[in-house]
Amino acid sequence: MNKPKKVAILTAGGLAPCLNSAIGSLIERYTEIDPSIEIICYRGGYKGLLLGDSYPVTAEVRKKAGVLQRFGGSVIGNSRVKLTNVKDCVKRGLVKEGEDPQKVAADQLVKDGVDILHTIGGDDTNTAAADLAAFLARNNYGLTVIGLPKTVDNDVFPIKQSLGAWTAAEQGARYFMNVVAENNANPRMLIVHEVMGRNCGWLTAATAQEYRKLLDRAEWLPELGLTRESYEVHAVFVPEMAIDLEAEAKRLREVMDKVDCVNIFVSEGAGVEAIVAEMQAKGQEVPRDAFGHIKLDAVNPGKWFGEQFAQMIGAEKTLVQKSGYFARASASNVDDMRLIKSCADLAVECAFRRESGVIGHDEDNGNVLRAIEFPRIKGGKPFNIDTDWFNSMLSEIGQPKGGKVEVSH
């Protein structure tokens, strides 16, 4: 075993209900094995690494690290920084003109005496970590980078289950359980529940499934109008499945006529190509982030779907609600805590072996929990619409299954 002298932890990208739990789990595991190993946490993700801004993990922090399990978010802070996007790093004042952000980051790790870097983030964070690991190896820095995969989308190849996704689905279901009662406030109400998921419908589908489990456990009073039908999910739209707007409008109008409301779950990535084409045709700029991704909050797919359907189904009022920030900023649930603990424990074990990679259940190797090689990590894993539970749900809510759509990342 090659004992690390100093370990650094950073979180990056958007939030997911696992970050604090993962930070706490890593600190606790290192402390259990050898409390003499120094730990620092870079403030604000890769931004903190570039600027040399970090928190020391003191004895008091080690003692109370378990407190982090109770809170959502990331106490050490996140940022969206791509080390290979030199222009953006210069523009944001993170490096000087002419500097290579990867070299600045590597030199800062050396300056801080770090020999193990733990990155906790999604596909962008871990591809950035992969680039940094390759740079370190090419230039003989002798540092090990170990990633933990967080994303509410559950869309990272070849990882079976990303950290935080189960919790996000559960929290999105809880969110809509309150919102859905708004159908009492107005006749012929259309409620659109927009769920996070850039190019992957897993979270939308899983949120709908978790929500329907809540309905399964509920008690109803149809004699006074409290029916499951009015609380039901009437349609689920994901990027990987084609949508026949006219046919769906006809079906949903029948639901509206019968139940007096329609509840739609839609992925924020569904219909984006059509929306972007519409924006470009009008000469409008399509906003993008540092990684080149379309800023979905500016594109507003839920609003677009609401506008498409409202007139066709005869809605008197349309309500569009987004559960994304509510869900992603939650503390981890029990299932995720268990997954996070097992991944963090293996990450520490890999640190002692100086084994780089992203910790996860490898779908290409029998779903074994291991350090997956960085070059094999990539985003954009689509949701499999042929999954049994998804097909059963579509059948139960009376929604015809659309054809498969190839989604781009």
Curated annotation (Swiss-Prot):
Keywords: Cytoplasm, Glycolysis, Kinase, Magnesium, Metal-binding, Transferase
pH behavior: Optimum pH is 8.0.
GO biological process: fructose 6-phosphate metabolic process
Enzyme nomenclature, EC number: 2.7.1.90
Pathway(s) of this molecule: Carbohydrate degradation; glycolysis; D-glyceraldehyde 3-phosphate and glycerone phosphate from D-glucose: step 3/4
Taxonomic superkingdom: Bacteria
Cellular localization per UniProt: Cytoplasm
Annotated GO MF terms: 6-phosphofructokinase activity; diphosphate-fructose-6-phosphate 1-phosphotransferase activity; metal ion binding
Activation/inhibition comment: Non-allosteric.
Residue sites binding diphosphate per the record: 14
Cofactor: Mg(2+)
Record InterPro entries: ATP_PFK, PFKA, Phosphofructokinase_dom, PKF_sf, PPi-PFK_SMc01852
A GO cellular component annotation in the UniProt record: cytoplasm
Assembly and interaction partners: Homodimer.
Protein name: Pyrophosphate--fructose 6-phosphate 1-phosphotransferase
Lineage, highest ranks first: Bacteria, Pseudomonadati, Pseudomonadota, Gammaproteobacteria, Methylococcales
